Amino acid sequence: MNDFHRDTWAEVDLDAIYDNVENLRRLLPDDTHIMAVVKANAYGHGDVQVARTALEAGASRLAVAFLDEALALREKGIEAPILVLGASRPADAALAAQQRIALTVFRSDWLEEASALYSGPFPIHFHLKMDTGMGRLGVKDEEETKRIVALIERHPHFVLEGLYTHFATADEVNTDYFSYQYTRFLHMLEWLPSRPPLVHCANSAASLRFPDRTFNMVRFGIAMYGLAPSPGIKPLLPYPLKEAFSLHSRLVHVKKLQPGEKVSYGATYTAQTEEWIGTIPIGYADGWLRRLQHFHVLVDGQKAPIVGRICMDQCMIRLPGPLPVGTKVTLIGRQGDEVISIDDVARHLETINYEVPCTISYRVPRIFFRHKRIMEVRNAIGRGESSA
């Protein structure tokens, strides 16, 4: 690859993302919109590349966490409707309106300030967030809800486009709290004189498990990337998800250690016999965290343990034998019959699968595959992007 100069890279299978969205499109009622969630650089997969693929596969809208992410998509040529799920500043409402970006609203005082600051000419579309039990953002009070709706109706350039909530436990096998939140949302809908054009409550877990409780839009996030919302509900999903992200490197140095020789900072690993040790150019600055010591990678189709402490830019693995420099190493993905999934990495880190691709940093170039060929290489360092 001429687009990056270190032998570490991630591969993003856009065909897998396309299939995951298309399969959801088939599962849902025909009149249900799909909002593809591409916040956090599309969970580390690549925002604009995933956005385009999701829209091609049947999504009609996009969601991000904050306004800067939405503006970045606009700058990259994305014209589809975008919703900011998080909080925005009242002073930025004009910029959002100019760029046709919808904002989440959940406070009447915020709307009052935005109303005083904005006089047009573009409409500002709002989605009213209701707190049914997540305890994060959202309105809980009927009177506050009515104040917000009245403020929107009073302003000539404010439009109430949507109403939504977020489930805290839709990814758990037990559905008691999910049912409580759903029932509460139905009750809150009665606080409005009429429903806005878009009503949405279902995240990935709810949209896959309860397609009959999605109103007329779902927010498709983690499952779009081929990851189950939780290990517990993975067997309950209506179709198999296709994991899109893999991570690779190459051996840059191979050496034989004698019994008693040490490896890495702190000299925490000691060779017990003659051992072949390989160095690969990836470390915790790339998101391959120090806690992954004692985990494993795949090399020559076999598992190879990570030995010694993971460094900022490199780590060491115990090889099955004297392999040549340049041999491919897979940290996430498949080699032969062996697979390391994102769930495997998350389990070792004692975290959720969402965190793993999000953690792989901008230093790691992304290679995007579409129709089983390289479509684009994105290197956030230096020369940026190139297309095949």
Curated annotation (Swiss-Prot):
Class in the EC hierarchy, top level: isomerase
Pathway listed: Amino-acid biosynthesis; D-alanine biosynthesis; D-alanine from L-alanine: step 1/1
Residues annotated for substrate binding in this entry: 136, 312
Molecular function in Gene Ontology: alanine racemase activity; pyridoxal phosphate binding
Effect of residue 354 to N: 81-fold increase in serine racemase activity
Active site: 39 (proton acceptor), 265 (proton acceptor)
N6-carboxylysine modified-residue sites: 129
UniProt-listed SUPFAM superfamilies: Alanine racemase C-terminal domain-like, PLP-binding barrel
Function text: Catalyzes the interconversion of L-alanine and D-alanine. Also weakly active on serine.
The family this protein is said to belong to: Belongs to the alanine racemase family.
Name of the featured protein: Alanine racemase
Protein source organism: Geobacillus stearothermophilus (Bacillus stearothermophilus)
